[in-house]
Regions:
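Structural signal for hydrophobic packing residues in well-ordered secondary-structure cores
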Residues: 20-27, 82, 116-120
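General beta-strand structural signal in soluble alpha/beta enzymes
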Residues: 31-35, 66, 91, 99
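Short active-site-adjacent structural elements
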Residues: 41-42, 71-76, 106-108
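C-terminal functional extensions of proteins
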Residues: 77, 84-121
C-alpha cells in the first residue's frame, strides 16, 4: 500500500498534503491529491507500479509546483522537449494579466490572451 511521503524536511510535501485536506474539507468539485511525484502525476503505469490508488494518480489535469523556479523549469521542459504550447495568466485581481515569455511563439501568446479572456467570465 502506498503511503504519501510527507516530510517535515520538505515543505512542499506538507503544503501538498494541506491542499489535499483543504479540498476535502471544502467539498470542491474536483479531485485533489498530493504530494505526488511528477511521474506518478502523469503516468498511470508509474503510479500503478508504486501502488498508488487514487483517481488523480497518472491522470492529473493540473500540476502544482512549490515555487516559480520549479514551475518555469517544468513549463520549459514541456515546451521544448514535448512540443507543448504554454499559456500564462495571473488571475485573482480585478482583471486577468497575460504572462508571456520573450521567446514565446505567436501561438503561445495567442493562447495566453485566449486564457485571459476565458478568465474574465
Amino acid at each position: 500500500m502506498y503511503k504519501r511521503q510527507v516530510l517535515d524536511s520538505v515543505p512542499s510535501t506538507k503544503e501538498a498534503e494541506e491542499l489535499t485536506n483543504l479540498a476535502k474539507k471544502e467539498n470542491l468539485n474536483a479531485d485533489v491529491f498530493g504530494p505526488l511525484a511528477f511521474d506518478n502525476s502523469i503516468s498511470k503505469k508509474s503510479a500503478e507500479i508504486k501502488g498508488i490508488k487514487n483517481v488523480v494518480a497518472g491522470d492529473a489535469d493540473v500540476l502544482l509546483v512549490p515555487n516559480v523556479e520549479a514551475g518555469n523549469a517544468l513549463v520549459k521542459i514541456m515546451v521544448y522537449f514535448m512540443g507543448a504550447c504554454a499559456a500564462g495568466v495571473v488571475v485573482g485581481g480585478k482583471v486577468p494579466i497575460v504572462i508571456t515569455s520573450r521567446s514565446d511563439v505567436a501561438t503561445a501568446r495567442l493562447a495566453s490572451i485566449a486564457a485571459a479572456v476565458v478568465a474574465l467570465d
